[in-house]
From Swiss-Prot:
Region (Disordered): 290-357, 576-600, 680-724, 847-948, 1168-1206
Phenotype of the disrupted gene, per the record: Grows relatively normally on bacterial plates, but is unable to grow in axenic culture due to a loss of fluid-phase endocytosis. The morphology of growing cells appears flattened, elongate, polarized and dominated by a single large lamella. Able to aggregate but not to form slugs, and does make highly aberrant fruiting bodies. Cells move unusually rapidly and have lost the ability to perform macropinocytosis. Crowns, the sites of macropinocytosis, are replaced by polarized lamellipodia. The majority of F-actin is concentrated in a single large lamella, at the leading edge of the cell.
BP GO annotations: actin filament organization; aggregation involved in sorocarp development; bleb assembly; cell motility; cortical actin cytoskeleton organization; negative regulation of cell migration; phagocytosis; positive regulation of macropinocytosis
Keyword Transferase part of the UniProt annotation: no
Keywords of the record: Coiled coil, Cytoplasm, Endocytosis, Guanine-nucleotide releasing factor, Phagocytosis
Transmembrane segments: none
InterPro entries named among the record's database cross-references: Ras-like_GEF, Ras-like_Gua-exchang_fac_N, Ras_G-nucl-exch_fac_CS, Ras_GEF_dom_sf, RASGEF_cat_dom, RASGEF_cat_dom_sf
Chief subcellular location: cytoplasm
Stretches of the chain forming a coiled coil according to its record: 135-186, 722-798, 871-898
Bias (Low complexity) ranges: 576-591, 683-724, 853-887, 906-916, 924-940, 1168-1187, 1197-1206
Record's compositionally biased regions (Basic and acidic residues): 888-898
Alphabetical list of PANTHER family matching this protein: GUANINE NUCLEOTIDE EXCHANGE FACTOR, RAS GUANINE NUCLEOTIDE EXCHANGE FACTOR B
The protein, known as: Ras guanine nucleotide exchange factor B
């Protein structure tokens, strides 16, 4: 809505305080506002058809006459009558002062409509929205250019050049707007600001290179979508700054943007207007965001003098400047600490904004201490955290690490000053509020993506704190200075001891930011309002409290810096804190569900065991333990969402710790390459202990631990020290085990001495084997370290992140939730399964470079280290307590692989929490010695879902089994995203009974007392045959009425593109632009392949196909081909994960998108038969009655239909809608349930077109006869009606029929067929009305015997035609001109001579539209230059379609002539573009009834003969004017 105020010289407004009273201008009135430029008084543009607000003069304070007006605080009367509304200051209000002293104030959605106002705009939000609008317009221009370029004619060449100039100008304007936008205030998370700004600048360069210089590269059109994405990210921020006054500011809920229709109370209007933002530089305020502004306080009644004005920044006045972060001082082995002075000029709203910036270069560091800046703001109950920037910049040639930490935050609570200078003038302590909104980003997926950003930052901060604490420990234990100080001053405070330590200071500041971000994270998670998120957030808050309590011992001064955090979280006293901490520590050590400890924590407890009496070591160790628990719990919330069993001990398998709906955090909006958790691979050198300490956050072995991308020498030394201690521990454990074995009771005396000697020999052999295995392990570890160092160099160049670890994907509890299960409650599918997002990671570890070292990946799991050395095979089904005698006492011997891992008989049926991919590969290699490909374990229900043949025949076996089954390794990655195993191995776990079976589907894997008795066998069929068979089976699940696979048409899968054989292109010389070439003619399969191509998104091609497919196929065949395309198999033996990610998934999404467009445009295609509403055959009804239902017209049969096996089958086919529903339900298991629900909702959203309600005929005889009509309506009645009224009501009737014309009526010349009334009712209605009105014009003139009356009637018809021209009703205009130019009327020269010259000129001007030269060039030029609404002459389009149909073949060389369909679509598209915008004319029943009773002349030839005879009687040939005038009536 546009709001306009205008003023004049006598009453000029200086401030908005004076603009108080508004009234609405009457609706439907045109308001023309002229903005003048310079002295030329040149009009720039007009604003018309607006509902504006008129400004009243000022009124005296005493003029309150009780007329609904109220007096505000300043004594200015506010008129509240006539529905007055007030400005919403949260919208973009622009003030423009022109040369004629005219003020323009507007509330607008974007600036594309008013480019001249851009120079006056200072609101970042509307600049951004305008920029997005410009990008959308550029995309439209680009598509128009491509269309013009494809149709090379002389006229299109001129249009192409003109449009190309406009397009390049738009590119330049876009570049300027984007750069101006990036200069605005910081509206985003600082941690991602640099990457976003850098990406936007890079995209601008690419766009300018691809689209401005040289030819247009249509392949790079995705650059604009990427630019939109980054601009939207740039704008996101939680608004929490409220006006700097005591006014009641009403804000919307967190999921809704502020509505322009909200009405502020009159009492608050003055305060709102007085706080109107002044135009200032964006850099003057640190808290500008997209929804609210920092307002200058111009209210004289408010005594709260804030210093945070836009033009006078308090940060500069008080010399409290925040130190910059770019301090690269080259100091030599010195630690320079600069403390800036604090000027305590605290106002009533003073808050401490801490900013500490550290630039670390090797051992030289510069620490800039925080300063206090007084910024006057109030923080409402929403997070406004400029999240901490913790970016690691690594140089591979040196050990230089730059860490910048900035903490400038407003947090979750109302912030008030804690100083003693709080005056009574501060009225900001009780500001009512609602939850602010995400202005531009309201979609849940975007919120979730931003929550993930915060989560990543929290994990990064945990990692940094951990590294700095390790450095602190190394320094404390190795530096003699600290050792001496600690011995001399046992009671010395920790903060005093480490006050000059860089690691200590940085860790403290990062921890402050971590606490803030965790609160922000929890609050945002609660806003998502998913299942169990609120309960989970409470648990996480408790974990945060425990971390805070334990950290207070290490950082005693931390509470001084947390005055603007939610302090109610930390209200417990120190006694309760100590008790809670102790209890928590005890529970974590005694409760089996919490016995999992961090690798770092366990190592520290052993490495510093000699220093247990040292309180500092214990304190740091305690903080590290709590930090690991903290990061682990956060990771569980955002990562482990589907039946997580990673943090639960084997004794508590029945407990559920997951929240299935929380899977949105990983699968709702992220792709496979999106960073979710930090995976550190092959980062450090040393033993297996060092590598095991760097695991993913969702690892099942222990709580989370991190490492930085590069290590400082001190941290590397500590890791090496820990590795040595671990080796010593292992040796001590071996000695203890030997001592325990010696203490065991002696063997039974009845045992012979020979058997005893044999046992001793076996023990010695086993010990030798163990030593050999240890040596082999050490060699493998050394090789692994070398490969890790090489891979780490590549990782440092391009960090690799994965959304979840491969281990967590395979370790799946059988009792948990199922992947991709349809939610039966709301009939919608759950979000995409988590494991689908990790196919890339799994395949990289199995088939890529890392897959070559898959046998050595066991070292990455800390829980497997003890198994390597001691053979502790502790599984759920078989617990062996003795370490070296297990093999002798148990009959189930453990088979040892080459890597030294042992597995008992139960390890193949149940996955433990420490199982890794390398372990599974080793198990498979031992179980199937004849197979060269390792096998993997998979839960039975997971395998059960993907194997459909086995699904039907052995459903009862798999459903009753809870054990895991073995699948072939080759299947991994080929089916995880699609449910499509290329070579499914139906291996059936038996219930403890060995044997074989499976009905020829493979060898059965039976687990009994004898261990593994069976192996795996692959099928004899080839890979391509299995893929094709699976596609056929998937298709037959939808088309379940097919009884044989032979009835399935597989041509779309087998037919390959062969140029000049099954497809012909127009520009076939341009090989580089192959995917964007226009098809001239092709087979139906090739057209479907082009329609759903994975690498192309030609929307125009899609619309052309959907619009014209009826001319060469049927809806049943079209839907069948799309479904077959969805189940496209991998017949070219492409690498499976590449096929899934780059081919299969894009094709499936293209298919669903085509279905969506099809249903949106033509929902009637899915009805049997499609119904077309019309009024042509209805009796004329009263305005209060509804139209009667029409008989269902039959769909015209297309001229070309391809025969398929599906059509030739004798089985009765189900309806099209039923097949569509069955297919959409089948897509849910692939994670496309949300898309399917969206498509199905399109049917419910379809609305019937609004038709004009016509008055009923009194005589009830239907279409009247000619004689009755002429007798009923006299000449006086026609003269009594206004020419404009007749033209307007005729326009309403014509547009009602025109807007109802459907595409099916324009295909195959259906309007010229015998059944045109049923097939093309709306076209028939327009044609009949055209002929009726033309006949009415001729007969109304010729029925007047008096020449004067006849001349007057002719003038009346000319006026009606001219009124039709002014309304842009060219169809009615040409109908009236046809009647005036009929042979019987055209020859009445004496009658024409009585018409004035003025109307004769108008008539001659209108007759130019009838010029048929150059294919109606005059008419086409005028109609193309006219803006809608308009009604074109339908006859010309029907003529064009007839020429296209008759002049072009349907088939060429047996292929579909698609070029002909494009020509048809272009004509139909031009017809449709005028159907969108209608007329705003009120119907008049009396005139409508008169026009509806116009007689229909069935015999046009006879009517023309009758009118010509009547014309001869009125004006005989060779008669004079006088004779005609004297003739008798």
């Amino acid at each position: 809505m546009v709001v306009i105020l205008w003023g004049w010289n006598e009453n000029r407004f200086n401030t908005l305080d004076q603009v108080i009273s508004f009234d609405f201008i009457e609706e439907n009135k045109k308001l023309y506002l002229k903005i003048l430029e310079n002295e030329k008084q040149q009009k720039i543009y007009n604003i018309s058809n607006l509902i504006g607000r008129r400004m009243d003069n000022y009124r005296d304070n005493n003029n309150n006459n009780g007329n609904g007006s109220n007096i505000n605080n300043n004594g200015i009367i506010i008129n509240s009558s006539m529905g007055s509304q007030y400005f919403n200051l949260n919208k973009g209000i622009i003030i423009v002062e022109s040369d004629n002293e005219t003020f323009l104030i507007e509330e607008i959605d974007y600036l594309g409509k008013f480019p001249i106002l851009k120079q006056f705009i200072k609101c970042e939000e509307f600049i951004g929205i305008s920029t997005l609008e410009i990008i959308s317009n550029i995309e439209k221009q680009l598509s128009n250019l491509v269309n013009l370029k494809s149709n090379t004619t002389e006229q299109t060449d001129r249009k192409y050049k003109t449009n190309l100039i406009d397009f390049k100008e738009s590119i330049i304007q876009l570049e300027k707007d984007c750069k101006n936008l990036l200069k605005q205030s910081n509206l985003i998370n600082p941690s991602i600001k640099y990457s976003v700004v850098k990406s936007v600048k890079f995209l601008l360069k690419e766009i300018k290179f691809e689209f401005y210089h040289g030819d247009i590269n249509i392949k790079r059109i995705e650059l604009f979508q990427q630019l939109k994405k980054f601009l939207k990210i740039h704008f996101w921020n939680n608004p929490n700054l409220i006006l700097n006054s005591g006014s009641n500011i009403d804000m919307t809920d967190s999921n809704d943007s502020i509505s322009s229709e909200e009405i502020n109370s009159p009492n608050d209007l003055n305060l709102s207007l007085s706080s109107f933002p002044s135009i200032s530089s964006p850099s003057n305020s640190s808290y500008n965001n997209i929804n609210t502004l920092t307002f200058s306080n111009n209210n004289n009644n408010n005594n709260n003098n804030s210093n945070n004005n836009n033009n006078n920044n308090n940060n500069n006045n008080n010399n409290n400047s925040i130190i910059n972060s770019n301090n690269n001082n080259n100091s030599n082995n010195n630690s320079n600490i600069s403390n800036s002075s604090n000027n305590n000029n605290n106002n009533s709203n003073n808050s401490n904004n801490i900013s500490i910036n550290v630039s670390k270069t090797g051992n030289n560091s510069v620490i800039n201490s925080p300063t206090q800046s007084s910024s006057c703001y109030i923080d409402c109950d929403d997070t406004m955290s400029n999240y901490t920037d913790c970016t690691n910049t690594t140089n591979t040639n040196s050990t230089t690490t730059t860490t910048t930490t900035t903490t400038t935050y407003g947090n979750n609570l109302n912030v008030y000053n804690n100083n003693n200078n709080n005056n009574t003038n501060n009225n900001n302590n009780n500001v009512p509020y609602k939850k602010p909104a995400l202005k531009m980003m309201k979609s849940p997926s975007f919120k979730i993506q931003l929550i993930q950003e915060v989560y990543l930052e929290i994990m990064d901060q945990c990692k940094k704190i951990q590294n700095y604490l390790y450095e602190l420990l190394d320094t404390y234990l190795t530096d003699e200075e600290y050792i001496n100080n600690n011995n001399n001053n046992n009671n010395k405070d920790i903060s005093i001891l480490f006050e000059n330590n860089t690691s200590y200071c940085i860790a403290q500041e990062i921890f402050i930011s971590l606490i803030k971000n965790s609160n922000d994270f929890l609050y945002q998670v609660q806003l998502i309002d998913l299942t169990d998120t609120r309960k989970k957030s409470k648990e996480l808050s408790e974990v945060s409290n425990q971390l805070f309590y334990s950290t207070q011992q290490l950082f005693p001064s931390i509470s001084d810096h947390l005055d603007f955090i939610e302090m109610d979280i930390f209200t417990n006293n120190n006694t309760t804190t100590t008790t809670t901490t102790t209890t928590t520590t005890t529970n974590t050590t005694t409760n089996p569900s919490n016995t999992i400890k961090s690798s770092h924590s366990s190592l520290l407890s052993s490495s510093y065991s000699s220093s247990k009496d040292d309180d500092i070591v214990l304190t740091i160790n305690k903080v590290l333990s709590k930090l690991d628990t903290f990061s682990k719990e956060y990771t569980k919330l955002i990562g482990n969402n589907l039946s997580s069993n990673y943090y639960v001990d084997s004794g508590n398998n029945n407990e559920s710790v997951s929240s299935p709906k929380c899977g949105l955090f990983l699968s709702h909006s992220l792709s496979t390459d999106s960073p979710m958790t930090y995976v550190k691979r092959n980062t450090s050198s040393g033993s297996s202990a060092s590598t095991s300490s760097y695991t993913t956050p969702v690892s099942s072995s222990a709580s989370l631990s991190f490492s930085s991308s590069t290590q400082t020498p001190s941290s590397a030394a500590s890791q090496h020290h820990i590795q040595q201690i671990l080796q010593q521990q292992q040796q001590q454990q071996q000695q203890q085990q030997q001592q325990q074995q010696q203490q065991q009771p002696q063997q039974i005396q009845s045992q012979s001495q020979q058997q005893h000697q044999q046992q001793q020999q076996q023990q010695q052999q086993q010990q030798q084997q163990q030593q050999q295995q240890q040596q082999q392990q050490q060699q493998q570890q050394q090789q692994q370290i070398q490969s890790q160092s090489q891979q780490q160099q590549q990782l440092n160049r391009k960090p690799h992140y994965s959304s979840i670890s491969p281990t967590s994907m395979l370790v799946y509890n059988a009792t948990g939730g199922k992947f991709g299960v349809v939610n039966q409650n709301n009939n919608s599918a759950e979000s995409t399964p988590t494991f689908q997002l990790n196919t890339m990671d799994i395949l990289n570890s199995l088939m890529g470079k890392e897959g070559q070292n898959s046998n050595t990946n066991n070292a990455n799991n800390p829980n497997n280290n003890n198994n390597n050395n001691n053979n502790n095979n502790n599984n759920n089904n078989n617990n062996n307590n003795n370490n070296n005698n297990n093999e002798n006492k148990n009959e189930n011997k453990n088979e040892t692989n080459k890597s030294g891992h042992n597995y008992n008989n139960s390890s193949t049926s149940t996955l433990s929490s420490s199982t890794t991919i390398g372990d599974l590969a080793n198990v498979s290699s031992t179980n199937s010695p004849n197979s060269s490909t390792p096998n993997l374990l998979l839960p039975p229900h997971q395998f059960h879902n993907h194997n459909r043949e086995y699904n039907h025949s052995h459903h009862h076996l798999l459903s009753s089994s809870s054990n895991n089954v073995m699948i072939n390794n080759r299947s991994i990655g080929k089916s995880f995203s699609t449910g499509n195993f290329s070579q499914p191995q139906p291996i059936m776990p038996s219930n403890g009974i060995g044997g074989s079976g499976g009905g020829g589907l493979g060898t059965t894997l039976s687990v009994g007392n004898g261990g593994i008795v069976g192996g795996l066998q692959s099928r004899s069929s080839s890979f391509e045959e299995n893929q094709l068979q699976y596609a056929i089976e998937s298709f037959m699940e939808v088309y379940n009425h097919l009884t044989s696979k032979d009835k399935v048409d597989t041509s779309i899968w087998l037919e390959e593109e062969k140029e000049d054989i099954n497809v012909y292109y127009i520009n076939n010389t341009n090989i580089d632009d192959k995917f964007y070439r226009s098809i001239k003619y092709a087979s139906l399969n090739q057209l479907i392949l082009k329609l759903t191509c994975e690498s192309n998104t030609e929307l125009r091609f899609t619309k052309t196909f959907i619009t014209t497919y009826r001319s060469f196929t049927t809806g049943d065949i079209f839907l069948m081909k799309l479904i077959q395309r969805y189940f496209t198999p991998n017949l070219k033996n492409i690498v499976p994960y590449q096929f899934v990610q780059k081919i299969q998934i894009p094709i499936q999404l293209r298919v669903l998108n085509v279905l969506r467009l099809w249903i949106e445009q033509y929902p009637s295609d899915f009805q049997q038969p499609p119904q077309i509403t019309t009024q042509s055959t209805q009796p004329i009804q009263n305005s209060t009655t509804q139209p009667q239902p029409q008989p269902q017209p039959q769909q015209p049969q297309p001229q070309l239909q391809q025969s398929t096996n599906l059509q030739n089958s004798t089985i009765q086919q189900p309806s099209l809608f039923k097949m569509l529903t069955a297919f959409l339900n089948s897509t849910r298991r692939n994670g496309h349930g949300q898309y399917s629900d969206l498509i199905l909702k399109k049917f419910k959203q379809q609305k019937q077109k609004d038709r004009l309600q016509l008055p009923i005929i009194n005589n009830g005889q239907g279409i009247p006869k000619a004689k009755i009509f002429w007798m009923k309506y006299s000449t006086e009645f026609i003269f009594s009606q206004s020419s404009t009224d007749i033209a307007e009501q005729l326009t309403l009737l014509d547009f009602d029929s025109y807007k109802s014309i459907e595409e099916i009526e324009l295909l195959n010349q259906a309007w010229s067929k015998p059944d045109q009334k049923t097939n093309t009712p709306n076209i028939a209605s327009m044609v009949n009305r055209f002929n009726s009105f033309s006949s009415f014009v001729s007969w109304a003139i010729l029925r007047e015997n008096d020449i004067k009356q006849r001349s007057k009637m002719m003038l009346k018809m000319i006026k009606i035609c001219y009124a039709l021209y002014k309304l842009s009703n060219f169809n009615g205009l040409l109908a009236g001109l046809s009647g005036l130019m009929a042979s019987g009327v055209y020859r009445l020269n004496h009658t024409k001579s009585l018409i004035s010259k003025q109307y004769q000129k108008k008539f001659d001007f209108l007759c130019k539209f009838l010029d048929t030269k150059k294919s109606h060039k005059v008419y086409r030029d005028i109609i193309h230059s006219t803006c809608p609404p308009l009604i074109p002459y339908l006859g010309i389009y029907l003529t064009d379609l007839t020429f296209i149909e008759d002049g072009n073949q349907d088939e060429i060389k047996g292929l579909i002539n698609f070029k002909k369909r494009e020509m048809i679509f272009n004509t139909i598209l031009e017809i449709q573009q005028y159907q969108q915008q209608g007329y705003t004319i009120k119907p008049k029943p009396s005139v409508l009834g008169f026009l509806c009773e116009l007689p229909h002349m069935s015999d046009k030839k006879k009517f023309e003969d009758d009118t010509y005879e009547q014309s001869i009687l009125l004006e005989p040939k060779n008669s004079t004017k006088l004779e005609v005038m004297n003739a008798k009536k």
